Amino acid sequence: VLFRSTLWPVNTDIGWYDAVDGQRVITVFNPLWDNYAGYDHAVKLLRLQNVLTKEVETLTPETEEEFGNDPVRIYKGDITISGGYMNIFFMQNLPSSTDNKHRISLVRPQEDDTLYGEDGYVHLELRYNDYDDLTGRRSPGAVSYNLNSLDIPSETKGIKLKLNSEENGEVEVTFDLKTVGSNEKLTTNVDLSNMQLK
């Protein structure tokens, strides 16, 4: 298992990829050697694919309509927290045109006392706006949200995330941050090229 491992890419044929600080990617690779030059593994990169990377936004009465609250299809285990980011994989019901991209947002309440709840959890919502443009064609989607802007206190128990699930309606998912190794899932060959999100 390569979770929480340091990797050294030994192939240099990825010069086409322009790395941007803070940009999350899905990396497909083959492990070559263990314990290589101070890294856990040397790997041959097969593919790098950018993941939509966004900041947490503030939900206000003025932004409520723009963020929407349309249902989204997310399967159990497809929301993870790692490296200061919340990573979400889902099945997008594609819009009719690339000009009509849907919006997916991780939002925080406007008031800090609501964000940092008395229960010891940070309270967030996943919001989706399909702009009433659905084709019934599905494609995998992925998005990562930078949680570092939240200034989460060290005594925080975790994160409670509200979302509108296609399967279960309004639900709340709890992520306990104190459990090492929780909420991790091995991601394999996912093609995000058809995703239509902003």
Predicted features and spans:
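Short nucleic-acid-contacting surface segments enriched for D/E, G, S/T with interspersed K/R
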Residues: 13-28
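Surface-exposed beta-loop interaction hotspot
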Residues: 35-91
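Residue-level recognition of well-ordered beta-strand positions that form the cores
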Residues: 28-30, 89-91, 125-127, 146, ...
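Short, solvent-exposed, Trp/other aromatic-anchored flexible loops in extracytoplasmic proteins
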Residues: 20-23, 127-166
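Short helix-loop boundary/capping segments
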Residues: 75-134
